[in-house]
From Swiss-Prot:
Family statement: To M.tuberculosis ERP.
Domain of life according to the entry: Bacteria
Protein name as it appears in the record: 28 kDa antigen
Positions of the UniProt region annotated as Disordered: 76-105
Keyword Signal tagged: yes
Keyword vocabulary terms for this entry: Signal
Polar residues bias (residue ranges): 94-105
Signal sequence, renumbered to the chain: 1-22
Keyword Signal: yes
Length: 236
């Protein structure tokens, strides 16, 4: 019995000693190949700016290098690259593009066509003031009336050109054509070209199409009612 106990004890001790020695060796044998397979850490080098004035250029270079990887190239910005001409964007456009200047200040003929003609026209011709001679100064002229199959207002005008709050209604126009053009130009200058196009597509065109459809429906209804009314007339 004592010998058997000694054998079991020695076997257990040898097993524990073997595991204690083999475990660290196995750990290092497994860990080293996996550690060498991992990519090495990248170290980024940052270039120090010479002064504060160089910071915009350094930032632009970093942004352009980052975007160039995606195929995006930034155009050069003169205001941040330190050009010798500081007033590059503050020049007067009339010196290089005369079309952008105000023609009313230097050319009074454009504001008063009647006084700038040779000989000057002091009266008010019919063609320059059509509102004062409506209804028959030109016998051969065809009067302009409400478009066919549209829903006009009470005075024969189309309501969508008046107040924007009454689009599609039947209220007549209370402003003249000059005031309407000025209002449209002011709205275009305030909103911008893209927003004006969106306004025309989203508000004006649907109102026009709705008026056309309402006019077509009214025409169809009048055509369908007329035969029934004629059929009620007794034939003698």
């Amino acid at each position: 019995m004592p010998n058997r106990r000694r054998c079991k004890l020695s076997t257990a001790i040898s097993t524990v000693a073997t595991l204690a020695i083999a475990s660290p060796c196995a750990y290092f044998l497994v860990y080293e190949p996996t550690a060498s397979a991992k990519p090495a850490a990248k170290h980024y080098e940052f270039k120090q700016a010479a002064s504060i004035a160089d910071l915009p250029g350094e930032v632009l270079d970093a942004i352009s290098q980052g975007l160039s990887q995606f195929g995006i190239n930034l155009p050069p910005v003169p205001s941040l690259t330190g050009t010798d001409d500081p007033g590059n964007g503050l020049r007067t456009p009339g010196l290089t593009s005369p079309d952008l200047t105000n023609q009313e200040l230097g050319t009074p003929v454009l504001t008063a066509p009647g006084t700038g003609l040779t000989p000057p026209v002091t009266g008010s011709p019919i063609c320059t003031a059509p509102d004062l001679n409506l209804g028959g100064t030109c016998p051969s002229e065809v009067p302009i009336t409400t478009p066919i199959s549209l829903d006009p207002g009470t005075d024969g005008t189309y309501p969508i050109l008046g107040d924007p709050s009454t689009l599609g209604g039947t209220s007549p126009i209370s402003t003249s054509s000059g005031e309407l053009v000025n209002d449209l130009l002011k709205v275009a200058n305030q909103l911008g070209a893209s927003q004006v196009m969106d306004l025309i597509k989203g508000v004006v065109m649907p109102a026009v199409m709705q008026g056309v459809q309402n006019g077509n429906v009214a025409g169809d209804l009048s055509g369908s009612v007329t035969p029934a009314a004629i059929s009620l007339i007794p034939v003698t």
